[in-house]
Every structure is written in structure tokens, then in C-alpha cells.
């Protein structure tokens, strides 16, 4: 008889939220949201920008155009992986602090875990992507999990095998990329398979305008209304409209990307 999954804690060994101690609005947002969903979690406040010493930066990062806030976020992801390794957690869930969970997040996550359980060890499952470009084949899949490189890192599940491989890679390589590009790059180099939930479980508040962005200069130069409207348009045309167009291409016998 299969195990009944009712809570997020039934699905993963630990939940980490990466934040900065001075980001009070985001912290209160996370606390309320996760309380509403009944999710136990731990904040990662290690490596806030003012606390990072130069020696650590020199040890971890190579020369690049990355700003200190980007480096801080990379270090926070690494910290969560290190804790998972130290505690021998088999599977963890990592969020960034601008995450918004879908209304039925727990139900959808619990429904997806049996599919995650069938994956070979060494994986990452991305929970977002509602406004991100995907291939035509993404819309033709009937699977709950679709193989695809991640877009961003606001929410993902990963297992201990993948974590150990990433940390081993970092032992002998320096970082030149922000967190999302770094995870995508490392995983492709060390044979960690990445998947998306076909229907996203989370959104990113700094993308759709709820929070001011701290990292993305392309969004920070625009006003909140512009970012809200751009997000809604991208979500419509990259998901709903694309799904319809792919189905039309299939019916007409056109080439599918």
C-alpha cells in the first residue's frame, strides 16, 4: 500500500527559504504564506551581503560581473545544500523569499511526489516557469514532470545525490554565474537531470511586481505597473496562447519544435 501524502513534510525532509535579515516585507510575506499552508521551514540568513568577508568571496568566486547581492544568493543556495549534506536529508525543497505558492500548493506537491519518486537519483524538479518560454514539445507532454532545464531558482526540489555532486563540483571550481544560471550550468556538466512540473506550483513576486526586484536590472529600470503588465502578457502568450497554437500546429500537421 502506497504512503498517503498530506503535508509538505511528508514529501521532503526539509524546507529552506533564502532571505536577507533586513528584508522585513519579504520575511513577513513568507511567514504568513507558509503558516497558511501549514509548511514548516527554516530561513537561511547566512551570507547576507554586509556579512560576507573578502576571503570567502575570493575562495568561491572567480572574476565576473556579478554584484554582491548575486554572490550572496549563490552562497545561500550552497548553504542549504551543505545543511542537507550534513543532516543526510534525502530530499529538500528550496525557495527564494519572493516566492508565491499556488492556492492548492500542498495538494499539487503531494500529487507530484510519487512521480518524483520514480526518477533516478540525481535530479532537480523546478516548481515555477509560468511566464517562461518553453519548446512546443512541452505542451504535448501528458506527464506530470517534463524534462527541461530550469529557468530560475525561486522554487525547486532536489535530492541528496544531486546536492553531493554539486558540492563536489564546487570544491574544485569557482563560480562566475548567478544562482539560476549556475545551477543550470553545473547540473548539465555533472549529469543531474532537471524537470519541470507541467503546471507551475509557484510564481515569483519580484517578477510580477509585488516586490521591487533586488537582482534584475532589466526589471528595476521599469515601474511596477509595467512589470505587472509584462508578466501577465508573458504568462498569457507563453503558456495559454502557445498551448493553443501548438495544438493547432499538431492538427494541421505542421512541424513541432
Q: What positions do the PLM features span?
A:
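An acidic/histidine-cluster motif and surrounding catalytic segment
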Residues: 2-95, 99-257
